[in-house]
């Protein structure tokens, strides 16, 4: 709890220039980065496509959060990029178990994302197999949403199904709530606008990381 929580910058854009700029900024200080990819069907808008990413830089863990209605359409590009973790949504139109199987055979960790209206107990078969569960508490395809901290109640339900699973949070994380999220025993806090908007991104990242290490209300 707290000291085990990592802050992960997220990149969400449909502009390749912005993608490159944010990538350059974040790899200078972050140990792990999440790239959000959207198909324009599961989400209201599209992101830069996986095919536009020639390769992922070495020395940093990359997570791909694929917001797509048909995960199988994106699997070949994910396997080509070989990220640390690939996250697909439980609400997709396809069974994720064959996708997870192919990811694991390729040495890629498998993650399942859960929208706010999805009860974790209904996707037990995915949680039992996945390496990572992403509690999505924002608006699909957008950064800067207000965090719904009540979604963190899903942590204990997920842990009751698979105690050792890594749990991530995506949606509205900022300096005012990362301590609370860390104290809910969220392992990974993905941060969008609270890092992309400040001019000094490294300082913002360090402040978030320090806050996430604190325990309780006053410490």
Predicted regions and their residues:
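Active-site pocket-lining/capping segments in soluble small-molecule metabolic enzymes
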Residues: 113, 134
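Active-site/ligand-binding-proximal alpha/beta "capping" segment
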Residues: 138-139, 145-188, 194
